[in-house]
Amino acid sequence: MTNPPVCNIPDRRSRFATRLPDDRAYTASHFWLLLLGEGVYRVGFTQFATRMLGDLVEHGYEVEPGAAISLGDTVGWVEAFKATTDLYCPGTGTFLEMNTALETDPTLFDSDPYGRGWLYTFFGEPDPGATDVAGYVAQLDKAIDQIMGKPHGDE
């Protein structure tokens, strides 16, 4: 059985342009969740988040595989060129694994955020507030308007 092709939804706002895979759920905190199988989710930062953070300098995890996690828990941290941030859990369940490829090639974080630059996987239930790509585009437009100092919806 082959996977259906992923449609990348283009979005352009101000000077920021991105493509968003339509096979994922997105959170207001700029994480994506990809359902890999029954209850197993891969988590990563959106391209918007990686651009705001800059190049990955260092990262770490505060939980081990098999640990119970809850929505909003801090599971790790990312230090990037422009900022440092905690990694929050966009779901509830069991932490499965971290992406060890980032240890050997940290450029994957911002060069391939929807592919090989994923952060970790978990088993459980995703954030009930996560949206489809259209909902995330609306959130992203609002965030960019705030950064640009414009009321939402102005061009």
Language-model features, listed with the residues they occupy:
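Non-catalytic terminal segments and appended small domains
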Residues: 1-74, 85, 97-155
